[in-house]
Amino acid sequence: MPQSFSSIVRMGDYILKSPTLSKIAVPVAQQFVKLSGYRQLGLKFDDLIAEENDIVQTALRRLPEEESYARVFRIIQAHQLELTHHLLPKHKWTKPEEDKSYLLPYLLEAEAAAKEKLELDALELK
């Protein structure tokens, strides 16, 4: 069963609140990010979210114009770098402090709206 974005956020919050789970999960997550290499291409984590989902499409339409253009630029630049088998110079890599979620608030908002619409569509009047 596919998970919703809100359930993933709740799971992440739970892991970060638990000291034991946090000691295990945070270093593993940091190593995963380092090995995945998306920051070396100038991408942010939210750039990796698949766009084939209606909720993601809605969230992308709600993005501010400048953030949307920046996202498209990063993705096109990463594709070009991959085609030429190059990486960005180290000073142009996405830094961890720059890799903040810009799409998540819009995803959660779109997911809540879709859930509300589904509930209202299933409403039976007597």
Swiss-Prot record:
Component of the ubiquinol-cytochrome c oxidoreductase, a multisubunit transmembrane complex that is part of the mitochondrial electron transport chain which drives oxidative phosphorylation. Signal peptide: none annotated. It is a peripheral membrane protein. PANTHER family: CYTOCHROME B-C1 COMPLEX SUBUNIT 7, UBIQUINOL-CYTOCHROME C REDUCTASE COMPLEX 14 KD PROTEIN. Pfam families: UCR_14kD (PF02271). This is Cytochrome b-c1 complex subunit 7. Belongs to the UQCRB/QCR7 family. It is found in: Mitochondrion inner membrane. GO terms for molecular function: ubiquinol-cytochrome-c reductase activity. SUPFAM superfamilies: 14 kDa protein of cytochrome bc1 complex (Ubiquinol-cytochrome c reductase). It comes from Eremothecium gossypii (strain ATCC 10895 / CBS 109.51 / FGSC 9923 / NRRL Y-1056) (Yeast). GO terms for biological process: mitochondrial electron transport, ubiquinol to cytochrome c; mitochondrial respiratory chain complex III assembly. Component of the ubiquinol-cytochrome c oxidoreductase (cytochrome b-c1 complex, complex III, CIII), a multisubunit enzyme composed of 3 respiratory subunits cytochrome b, cytochrome c1 and Rieske protein, 2 core protein subunits, and additional low-molecular weight protein subunits. The complex exists as an obligatory dimer and forms supercomplexes (SCs) in the inner mitochondrial membrane with cytochrome c oxidase (complex IV, CIV). Keywords: Electron transport, Membrane, Mitochondrion, Mitochondrion inner membrane, Respiratory chain, Transport. One of its GO terms (cellular component) is matrix side of mitochondrial inner membrane.
